[in-house]
């Protein structure tokens, strides 16, 4: 559902899966289950990494070797979520003001309507909702692990509010991002609900460090591009050297042996999409030449390589 963003998966899980706990990580964001791991955070209280590698999953205790540890931690709490963002430090705005500032994509009147719905249908949440929206503490991304009973109650509350919102608001003139308004509201609603639980229910909770990975593509083992007569040619390059390699490939194409298949592989870390398109254009309609691009960034993320 394009309107509900990641909440689409949450709704499906609510309606189709019966488990003891429900958990969601989204948009290359993960919680670390290693309490002793202390890394530098940005102003948004997030640890940012270039690549999600085995090194990171091991350090964060989120690979298969730590399943028992994860299970034990989850069993001890009703809710696990991210360590919150201090918006005063990050941008100097409250939760409400931050939403209002994003006036190009979002409309603050929608946040006001959401608040009206809470007041009308769930008045016991209203004061907490106002406190959360007017405060500087934020929980983003709908990222959490929650016990079944709480999750079911949360989803019933959440989707009832969003359903009522869609009845009241005409989004037909909204931008593509504007259509995602229910998903954006859902982020704020999680913070409100979590804050309400902390203040009104005797729950146990734990807040974990949030990590963001710019690239989560895995490095798969390369196989030959052709099943026979495969001649591999590996090249190390970046965008700066692309024109020189284009000249080299042009020379190769002028001297091809029709009895051979040429498997050209660029080992790179930062080729732009346009660069790749231009290389592939060189071999258009040439059946015995393939060009592939292999991002080696994850392999060398924690290596110190010096060029002389």
Question: What are the residue ranges of the model-derived segments?
Answer:
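Short internal beta-strands
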Residues: 262-270
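General small-molecule cofactor/ligand-binding pocket signal
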Residues: 206, 265, 290-294
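Short, surface-exposed alpha-helical segments at coil->helix boundaries
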Residues: 187, 246-249, 273-280
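Active-site-proximal specificity loops/subdomain of glycosyltransferases
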Residues: 1-16, 275-276, 280-308
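ER/Golgi luminal nucleotide-sugar-dependent glycosyltransferases, focusing on the catalytic module
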Residues: 1-225
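Short, solvent-exposed loop/edge-beta patches enriched in aromatic
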Residues: 14-22, 229, 241, 254-261, ...
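N-proximal low-complexity "stem/linker" segments adjacent to membrane-targeting elements
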Residues: 219-250, 254
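Alpha-helical structural signal in soluble globular domains
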Residues: 193-196, 251, 255, 278-286
């Amino acid at each position: 559902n394009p309107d509900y963003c990641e909440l689409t998966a949450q709704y499906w899980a609510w309606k189709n899966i019966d488990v003891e706990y429900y958990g969601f990580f989204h948009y290359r964001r993960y919680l670390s289950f290693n309490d002793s791991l202390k890394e530098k955070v940005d102003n948004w209280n997030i640890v940012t990494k270039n690549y999600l590698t085995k090194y990171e999953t091991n350090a964060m205790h989120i690979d298969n070797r730590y399943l028992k540890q994860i299970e034990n931690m989850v069993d001890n709490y009703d809710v696990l979520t991210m360590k919150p963002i201090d918006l005063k430090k990050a941008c100097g705005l409250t939760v409400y003001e931050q939403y209002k500032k994003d006036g190009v994509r979002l409309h603050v009147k929608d946040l006001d309507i959401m608040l009206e719905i809470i007041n009308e249908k769930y008045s016991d949440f209203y004061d907490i909702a106002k406190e959360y929206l007017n405060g500087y503490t934020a929980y983003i991304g709908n990222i959490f692990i929650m016990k079944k009973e709480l999750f079911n109650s949360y989803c019933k509350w959440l989707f009832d509010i969003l359903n009522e919102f869609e009845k009241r608001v005409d989004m037909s003139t909204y931008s593509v991002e504007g259509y995602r308004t229910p998903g954006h509201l859902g982020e704020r609603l999680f913070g409100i609900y979590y804050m309400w639980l902390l203040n009104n229910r005797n729950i146990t909770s734990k807040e974990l460090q949030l990590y963001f990975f710019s690239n989560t593509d895995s490095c798969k083992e390369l196989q030959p591009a052709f099943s026979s007569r495969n001649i591999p040619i590996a090249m190390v390059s970046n965008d700066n050297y692309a024109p020189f390699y284009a000249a080299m490939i042009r020379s190769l194409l002028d001297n091809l042996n029709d009895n051979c298949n040429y498997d050209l592989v660029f080992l790179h870390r930062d080729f732009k999409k346009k660069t790749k398109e231009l290389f592939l254009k060189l071999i258009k309609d040439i059946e015995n030449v393939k060009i592939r691009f292999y991002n080696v960034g994850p392999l060398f993320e924690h290596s110190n390589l010096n060029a002389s």
